[in-house]
From Swiss-Prot:
Di- and tri-sumoylated in developing retina. PIAS3-mediated sumoylation promotes repression of cone-specific gene expression and activation of rod-specific genes. Sumoylation on Lys-178 appears to be the main site. This is Photoreceptor-specific nuclear receptor. It is found in: Nucleus. Orphan nuclear receptor of retinal photoreceptor cells. Transcriptional factor that is an activator of rod development and repressor of cone development. Binds the promoter region of a number of rod- and cone-specific genes, including rhodopsin, M- and S-opsin and rod-specific phosphodiesterase beta subunit. Enhances rhodopsin expression. Represses M- and S-cone opsin expression. It comes from Mus musculus (Mouse).
Length: 395
């Protein structure tokens, strides 16, 4: 098992291995016997195309990109630098995986020189502003957001642009704070030092690590919302303290939808040990599984998730707010966004908007105290959740 020991320049020992012979990876026998099929030259999994100079799978290309961009240094815990790197073992030693990426011919310069992709939010916004998206509708901004403006065409266009930018900011925040199943899988394994028992999303350490990352992403999502960061700082903290548990559950549901089941709901016996983690009661597990099934049945898309998160975050009834009117305007705007997106992208489902709103009460089935106890107590100990959230938010 590997562990991250620093964030600096790429280690010389690993970088030097790039000069070694890449070996004969890349072509495997087609199970049909017709001919060779493309394989990942790093782990042997099915290749999704050329990445950074070689044929590779999404998992290995993503791992290589993150390692280079973050300038991570890994240390082989076994010490020999000869750990197996195949589809079944690729997450066991990050040092050997990175070494094999370089040996196979992946180019670090291709990562560093890669153009950052334009966010989907900006693409969507540009399309709306140029009128190239026939499905887009004029977005009505809340008066409290738009503020007083002169009558006439100018005020209409300004209102529409404000609505477009609100939607764009939601989608941008969603893109910047998205945790993929593959990301969690690869980052979880740094929490264990035992090469024989790598942490996985279903292990005890994996559950706690994934929970912490999902909470961090929820806070990051809120911080990336300009309309949220424009609120008084005290209001931001109060809203986050009020909504963190629902944002965490929404993030966990969104993360688990592509998976067969949610690893966070794994029973203690499947997690390696029940010690240190209280088990979800059977009724709680069943209810959460049913909730995830409802999200899956509706095939909730990223934009809808973003709007639902905004509705959960912007609660004007939260006690202690300095500017509840502004928060209420943001909540109204979030509903407008969700309604118009549903009509534009799912015209054959006239009741979809209502069904999406009816998903929200299920997020309050587990109290914040219960979620903290089940998923975070071992990680944070006696540290108050409010302090953890504040530290995450400030950093």
């Amino acid at each position: 098992m590997s562990s991250t020991v620093a964030a600096s320049t790429m280690p010389v020992s690993v970088a030097a291995s790039k000069k070694e012979s890449p070996g004969r990876w890349g072509l495997g026998e087609d199970p049909t016997g017709v001919g060779p099929s493309l394989q990942c030259r790093v782990c042997g999994d099915s290749s999704s195309g050329k990445h950074y100079g070689i044929y590779a799978c999404n998992g290995c290309s993503g791992f290589f990109k993150r390692s280079v961009r973050r300038r991570l240094i890994y240390r082989c815990q076994v010490g020999a630098g000869m750990c197996p790197v195949d589809k079944a073992h690729r997450n066991q030693c990050q040092a050997c995986r990175l070494k094999k990426c370089l040996q196979a011919g992946m180019n670090q310069d291709a990562v560093q020189n890669e153009r950052q992709p334009r966010s989907m939010a900006q693409v969507h916004l540009d399309a709306m502003e140029t009128g190239s998206d026939p499905r887009s509708e004029p977005v009505v901004a809340s008066p409290a957001l738009a503020g007083p403006s002169p009558r006439g065409p100018t005020s209409v266009s300004a209102t529409r642009a404000m609505g477009h930018h609100f939607m764009a900011s939601l989608i941008t925040a969603e893109t910047c704070a998205k945790l993929e199943p593959e990301d969690a899988e690869e980052n979880i394994d740094v929490t264990s030092n035992d090469p024989e028992f790598p942490a996985s999303p279903c292990s005890l350490d994996g559950i706690h690590e994934t929970s912490a990352r999902l909470l961090f992403m929820a806070v990051k999502w809120a911080k990336n919302l300009p309309v949220f960061s424009n609120l008084p700082f005290r209001d931001q903290v109060i809203l986050l303290e009020e909504a963190w548990n629902e944002l965490f559950l929404l993030g966990a549901i969104q993360w688990s939808l592509p998976l067969d089941s949610c690893p966070l709901l794994a029973p203690p016996e499947a997690s390696g040990s029940s010690q240190g983690r209280l088990a979800l009661a059977s009724a709680e597990t069943r209810f959460l599984q049913e909730t995830i099934s409802r999200f899956r049945a509706l095939a909730v898309d990223p934009t809808e998730f973003a709007c639902l998160k905004a509705l959960v975050l912007f609660k004007p009834e939260t006690r202690g707010l300095k500017d509840p009117e502004h928060v209420e305007a943001l909540q109204d705007q979030s509903q407008v966004m969700l309604s118009q997106h549903s009509k534009a992208h799912h015209p054959s489902q006239p009741v979809r908007f209502g069904k999406l709103l009816l998903l929200l009460p299920s997020l309050r089935f587990l109290t914040a105290e219960r979620i903290e106890l089940l998923f975070f107590r071992k990680t944070i100990g006696n540290t108050p959740m409010e302090k953890l959230l504040c530290d995450m938010f400030k950093n």
